[in-house]
Amino acid sequence: MMNLEKNFDKTTLFNHMRTDKRGKCSDLNEYGTSCDKTTAVEYNKVHMAMTHYECNERGINFSRKSPLTQSQRTITGWSAFESNKCEENFSQSSAHIVHQKTQAGDKFGEHNECTDALYQKLDFTAHQRIHTDFTAHQKFYLSDEHGKCRKSFYWKAHLIQHERPHSGEKTYQYEECAKSFCSSSHPIQHPGTYVGFKLYECNECGKAFCQNSNLSKHLRIHTKEKPCDNNGCGRSYKSPLIGHQKTDAEMELCGGSEYGKTSHLKGHQRILMGEKPYECIECGKTFSKTSHLRAHQRIHTGEKPYECVECEKTFSHKTHLSVHQRVHTGEKPYECNDCGKSFTYNSALRAHQRIHTGEKPYECSDCEKTFAHNSALRAHHRIHTGEKPYECNECGRSFAHISVLKAHQRIHTREKPYECNECGRSFTYNSALRAHQRIHTGRKPYECSDCEKTFAHNSALKIHQRIHTGEKPYKCNECEKTFAHNSALRAHQNIHTGEKLYECSECGKTFFQKTRLSTHRRIHTGEKPYECSKCGKTFSQKSYLSGHERIHTGEKPYECNVCGKTFVYKAALIVHQRIHTGEKPYECNECGKTFSQRTHLCAHQRIHTGEKPYECNECGKTFADNSALRAHHRIHTGEKPYECNDCGKTFSKTSHLRAHLRTRSGEKPYECSECGKTFSEKSYVSAHQRVHTGEKPYECNVCGKPFAHNSTLRVHQRIHTGEKSYECNDCGKTFSQKSHLSAHQRIHTGEKPYECNECGKAFAQNSTLRVHQRIHTGEKPYECDECGKTFVRKAALRVHHTRMHTREKTLACNGFGKS
């Protein structure tokens, strides 16, 4: 703090004391001030805080009576002085006198250059200095503190006040909290901020303010007053008139009138000429005005000299402070001519007006999409760049938008501040609450302009419109595959990372997406919250309900552009299109086999894991697929829903019906690429091809014997279990295989359906016919490893081997071999 030696005579002391508006000076004892005895008594009233006058309303003490009187008038609103002409009231005599001079036209002086009228001598003297063209030696007070700015002042007091931010000096201290200030007005304004004491109250709404100027600004909200009228153009402004006049002021170069100041004229000329003589030594940026340079330099110094007296927030520019103060006053001076909505900032009004004009001036250089706001364009750019500058401190996840980060952080805090009035359900986001409330109202305000379909959410409409446009704005950085939905991209990216974030607590199954986990949990809980209004059937997922409702309406909105076939579900269309493209995007990690559907891959993988999660409630038998369980259930119920239109025969499985139809038609569309043999079913081809490859993927877990077919393995396993589940109704004999039972029943019926084409002989079993046909063909497929003799039947080979070679070996071992 600066040490100043001050010598006062009585008059100077009186003026010194008047600078302290509350009658109290802070931290002045260290100045070393000296005065005569009489003056010292008066001086001590100030510096020893001899406060004889106390305000009963506010509890504040004063050293003199006049500040107390003024304080009480402020609180009570009492005005002692009334104007004779306009009946305006004043609480101070000085203000009353000045007002009367204004009314009477009694001017202390009128300046020749600008005809401004001044009613007080002090004002007139100060005003003259504005017009006088002072030379360097006539500007008596020059700032040279630390060589900062060399700004000159007409008043020494202004110089001292100006130098304090350079020196860091804060001479005035508020004794309640020891906070120091550069200006004497700041500790006067500060107590109201410190104790929450706001003297100036609005009569309309009751809002209170620390400063009368802020109250005056606030009152304009109620009065709609725009006090500054410019005679030149007739427009009125809530902001100062001078600022507007600067924009209207013109000079000879641009066809207008002259400037009031030479410096203003020169500054304006630089703008027209593009001249920028003032350069920042930090970054080299140039400016046309020194004031602009000084304001810019605060970016480098971090200086924020303008402080809000309401909340103590600081700003680098005075204009920023002025705009900020509207937060406290509630002033919204910028009004929309179209809808009457008012705004705190002019920039906010301009942005709002684009709603009415439809203007979108900001265009994306990558995809040519346009936006109404520059901030929206910057946010959109991050889709193309992949930039996510906002990172969560809890989990490290990054986001493209700060609003999304803030919303995400509620996951960690578990905060759900938005509650539904109808059902009491709470939400993390306000948008989620609004969307939820449409469930209660049934409102769907968003309509597709192409197909007139309506949606409850705007986001759902935007996603839907991509069906018509074919737009896929989300691209994978790894494989460059594009997606219509961001969620689909995120799910896809987990294929590359292998990451599965969400785990089911019941069964441990993991999912890429939280929504998938929520849906999966309903398997365990049995919850089916979505009900069909037509038939009452319930579903675990909303998409299932939507698809089901199309059964009632007959709607099939998804059409194949290759063959014209239509589908109820889009997923069914996508799967169908793979028939035309031959695409099989799902590959088994164990054996490399590929599938066109994910469900087929999942079912296939259970072959390797042995998992059978679907259990029959009747017999306890387990299955790898839910469809297999449903088909099995029909054994217990006897249901055969699939009927042949030609012969009326019914089947429990649709695959059995298709196979039956091919038997009648003789169709065999599936051909083996190795030998050209054709089959009526695709599964038969797959099974047959194992003859060529020698593959036997099904292994018995008891004896380890491998099999080419799963059905063969199941039959084999009955040897170990002794199971014979197929019983003859005629004689009660049981069999391990259904085919054996069918063959046996022909003994009772005498049926011989298999006939030889060569000789017409008929047989009860197909295997017997095949053996018989070898008589005509001469085929003997079974060869003895010992002697090379061949046989028609496998049984004949076994008999030969036992009788001839096994007997010979036995005799040789006993010493009866050939000599």
Swiss-Prot record:
Keyword Ribosomal protein carried by entry: no
Record gene name: ZNF658B
Name assigned to this protein: Zinc finger protein 658B
Cross-referenced Pfam families: zf-C2H2
Zinc finger (C2H2-type): 141-166, 200-222, 278-300, 306-328, 334-356, 362-384, 390-412, 418-440, 446-468, 474-496, 502-524, 530-552, 558-580, 586-608, 614-636, 642-664, 670-692, 698-720, 726-748, 754-776, 782-805
Natural source organism: Homo sapiens
GO BP: regulation of transcription by RNA polymerase II
InterPro entries, A to Z: C2H2-ZF_domain, Znf_C2H2_sf, Znf_C2H2_type
Keywords on record: DNA-binding, Metal-binding, Nucleus, Repeat, Transcription, Transcription regulation, Zinc, Zinc-finger
Cell compartment(s), UniProt: Nucleus
Family membership: Belongs to the krueppel C2H2-type zinc-finger protein family.
Transcription among keywords: yes
